[in-house]
Each structure stands twice: as structure tokens, then as C-alpha cells.
Amino acid sequence: MLAGSLALAAPAPSSHAGASPAPSSGSRETAAEGCDEGPAACHGGVKWLYRYSYSLGVHPFTSPHEVRRQLTDHFWLFPVSGACPARIRPADECDLLGGNPVRVEAVGATRLQIATLPGHDLGDGLHIRFAFSRTFGFHYLVVSAWQDRPTRCTRSTPCAMASRAGAWALWKVLSATLAVSAYAA
């Protein structure tokens, strides 16, 4: 179905792992313990584990806020939503697919941020931000991740590489889903 959909795409900004944190912009609807500005503001400048950019195609009549709202109001669009509610809000805790617990840390006008909890396969204290933007009608999703402290997986090069590759593929599925659902936003 996704292959048959019409979506014009422009090249997204390059993706990179290990890049230095950059402050986010946009309004704060909800911040978790002052950490909504990312690792530079919260964790002494910890480097990103990854930062991937995806094009969602052309949606000239849809704002980044509407795309973010489409995801948080219809969380079943999230590829591994598991036992999470259909609509998520800040401070919600739920299990993603595979019994991986997360907490919704923040929901801003154009971003969603979650954190892994104890019992998650990747360890606790991993923060993942989904930020939405639009340039000349082209929408983009930037997914960034950082951690409070190294985990068993991030200390192991093969596991860390596999985790980043898996994240890239998973968020690619999310971006393809949002590229289609943004028409309904």
C-alpha cells in the first residue's frame, strides 16, 4: 500500500550518529524536569547516540504541529505501539511491543519525546525525540536519541551498531506511515 501511494520527496538533511547536541526550537507545551531542551541542557553535553532525518513528502496544507498531533492522538500509527493507549500524553507510561516500558517525557507543538524505563531491552534512561518540521511544503521527521548513562548495549560496539541500524529501519517505517497519514491530519 505504501509503495503505491503518491508522495513527492526532497532530500532530507543528512543523518548522523554521534553528532553534538543542538538546542531545539519551538514552543514548550510540556517539559519534563527541565530536560526538554535535550542533552546539552540536561546531561552536560552528552553526544547523540543517533540523529536520523526522514522526508515525509509534500504536504502544503498540513503543519508540523498537525503531523505531531496525528501521531500522539493516533499512537497506533507508531510501529511498535504495543500496549500503549491510542492517545498518549505527557507522563503516560506504557509497554511498547515486546514488553518494553517507556514514559512520555514531553509533547511539544512539533515534537514528542519518550524515555525508556527499567526493563526495556535497550536499558533505561534512553531518550528519543521525534521532531517535525516543514520547509517549502516538504515535511521532515528528525529522530534523535541520547542516554543518561551507558547501558550494556551501548557499551558493546556490535550491539550499539545493531541498535542504531534497527532504530534507523524502525523510524523509516514510522516516516513512511506518517507520509501517508499526514494527508488526513
Protein language model features and the residues they cover:
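Structured segments of extracytoplasmic/periplasmic soluble domains
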Residues: 70-78, 135, 172, 176
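Glycine-rich phosphate/pyrophosphate-binding loops
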Residues: 134-143
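Secretory targeting and sorting signals
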Residues: 1-19
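A conserved amphipathic terminal alpha-helix motif
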Residues: 148-185
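Hydrophobic ligand-binding cavity/cleft-lining segments
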Residues: 21-95
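Hydrophobic-ligand binding "helix-grip"
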Residues: 98-135
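Short, solvent-exposed aromatic-acidic interface loops
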Residues: 117-121, 143-156
